[in-house]
């Protein structure tokens, strides 16, 4: 338990930051899930639209420190490859 004023303030800040990060991570995962559902349905048009919406969200999460930028790039790349494979 925090005793000093500064420690109590840091506890509040951490709780606030954690809530924001949880929200951003959830938002990113929701967009990724929409792409994966579209891929599973086999509809390339819908999957491509979902991917175009998800890519900025994933990169924004990387910019905000939710995921590493290489992790974000890898997610986008793999999703794009899966969307492209639908046509083949």
Curated annotation (Swiss-Prot):
Molecular function in Gene Ontology: small ribosomal subunit rRNA binding; structural constituent of ribosome
Domain of life of the native organism: Bacteria
The keyword Cytoplasm belongs to this UniProt entry's keyword annotation: no
One of the GO BP terms on file: translation
One Gene Ontology CC term in the entry: cytosol
RNA-binding is among the record's keywords: yes
Pfam families in UniProt: Ribosomal_S20p
Keywords of the record: Ribonucleoprotein, Ribosomal protein, RNA-binding, rRNA-binding
Xref: PANTHER family: 30S RIBOSOMAL PROTEIN S20 (PTHR33398), SMALL RIBOSOMAL SUBUNIT PROTEIN BS20C (PTHR33398:SF1)
Family membership: Belongs to the bacterial ribosomal protein bS20 family.
Physiological role: Binds directly to 16S ribosomal RNA.
Protein name: Small ribosomal subunit protein bS20
Organism name: Methylorubrum extorquens (strain PA1)
């Amino acid at each position: 338990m925090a005793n000093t004023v500064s420690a109590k303030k840091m506890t509040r800040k951490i709780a606030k930051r954690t809530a924001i990060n949880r929200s951003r991570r959830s938002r990113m995962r929701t967009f990724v899930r929409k792409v994966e559902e579209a891929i599973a349905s086999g509809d390339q048009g819908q999957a491509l639209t979902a991917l175009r919406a998800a890519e900025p969200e994933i990169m924004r999460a990387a910019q905000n420190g939710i995921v590493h930028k290489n992790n974000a790039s890898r997610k986008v790349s793999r999703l794009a490859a899966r969307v492209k494979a639908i046509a083949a």
